[in-house]
Amino acid sequence: MERYRIRRERKEILKNEIEKQRDLIQKEDFRLMSNENNEHNDEHDNRLIELNKQLNILKLELEELRLQGDRFYVLNGDDTILMDIDETSKITFYLCRHFTDLTKIPIEESNESRILIVNELETVSDPSIEPIFEFQKVISSKSIHQLFSVKTNFDNNNNNNNNSNNNNNGNKPSLFERVKQNTWSLGISPLRRTTSDPTIFGERFSPPKSISNFIERFKDNKEKDKEKDNSSLSITIQNNNTATTTTTTTTTTTTTTTTTTTTTTTTTTPTSSTTVNTNINQEKLRKYSTTPSINQINNQQNIENNNNNNNNNQEIGGKILLTWSNKETSMYILKTQEESLELLELLGSHIDRSKKVTAKQSQTIKILFQKKSTIYESTNPDHEEYLKHLWSLLYPEQEFQKKSPLWKKFGFQSDDPTRDFRGMGIMGLLNLIHLVQHHNDWVQEILAQDRDYPFAVAGINISNLIFEVFQISEDSLQQPWYSSFWSSSYMAMLCSMSRHNDHAFEELYFLIFNLLDHLWIQMNATYMMFPLVIKKLKSQLNEISNFNPNSFDEVRARFDLIQRLNIIDNPIDQQQQQLQQQQQSLPLPSSPRSFLNNYQQTTTSSTSISPSKNTQNN
């Protein structure tokens, strides 16, 4: 599409500008190194600073373009696959097939599919040209954060041969050749991509703080290079002397090896036998298709291999290997190495952003856990300010009171709300403040409907529920960033929400509270059924997280979808009803203990409430 074309053109321009900028920086570095008298060092330093600023601006723009997504046509076996990467870091894989007649497209396969005209511009300019339709059927959809590693050109024989030749000649393979073996892996280091050659990170491309040491090392390397040149020159002279005695044999061998045989291959576009149109113009398909078949690429590579006899710099196809966190691997063939490297960099940009978001969110969660562990103290002025803030949001026209029946009306267990904060600390209070401040209309609507559960205590239990299902504890927060804790589906969902929202935890709290109220209505729940509603809520949360939503809007859409489906079975069967009748009245928990455990045992703590709202109000 047009936006992809414009984006790619801009990326190519930026790549060229970045290379030019790096050349300027390197030249400025050498000028500084060659200045043995240390004259005008400040001028050189300022110049380097300015050049690096300009380089960072270019790199930032290129990074932003890559984060907007792109699409790549690749080959997997005999199938043509479209990898569509969007701005939310989701990869959608489409199986592509081509038709010149819409009636040939199978209707039974049209679910989760789309049709595009690949030669639309040509048909507009020349109406005599028949349109070619590309049928794209969804194969799978995955989030980029599920990738474990990405590797490109992992079995490039030409590079291996070049490297071995360079090693035999005593020359180290060039940096370009080694970077072409570029590899990126989650398990190596956060927030950066690496290459398969770790020695690259030992090289410097700008002077260190100690310029004198760098110059000394630079001089030593130049002397070593001269020695290598002299040794290679003597080897070349010896080889020339021996070569003159074998001219006839070499000529005969060359004549023999340059004789080639011609083979013909048939270009086919992968389609099923029921949809093949024998009247399709194969020449048009080859001309307009953006996804050549395997045979086309093999044909092209054969031509390139023949041309490589005259030109060793001929471009060859690119390959990329994706390894997912579940150890599933898949290999794809692209048209060029440049395209595979661009795909590698694009995936790396999305993963870098994901790791940065995870690192930021991990710090936020640690702060939230500290607040959860902070016990509410009436003598602490900051804690009292929090309580005053909640009162002003609920009853702005009334003077603040530490103890009041209005607290019980809001859903606390008594006139003193501070007794309910013992389980979740000030975290439970802060979540209620955010809820009332940013979703006040919803709160007032629920309170007006007089639900059969105490609102404030239910909110405190939801705060505990989030920490429970996320498995947030003091031990889990000490785990490294690449552990299963930080890569869990729940944590990935929270991180995707926080990419464009600074209050992701609080907004997730609201979505869960809203879903709780919805389940309460759908299950026609009573006060005694609160633990069963919580159990159903956990099941729904697990289902939502397994969808791997990649943005705040997608998470919210998943919650809305659960509510709109209205397919919720009544969880109370006859046996459970009989069990309920035998149970004594159970309090609604306000401490961060398991809801189901509280359901099975009666608590007699001071935080317990009466078994029904009628007795509360009396």
UniProtKB/Swiss-Prot annotation:
Keyword annotations from UniProtKB, A to Z: Coiled coil
Protein's name in the database: ELMO domain-containing protein C
InterPro entries (alphabetical): ELMO_dom, ELMO_domain-containing
A biological process from GO: cell motility
Keyword Coiled coil annotated: yes
Origin species: Dictyostelium discoideum (Social amoeba)
Residue intervals passing through the bilayer: none
Domain ELMO, residue spans: 382-545
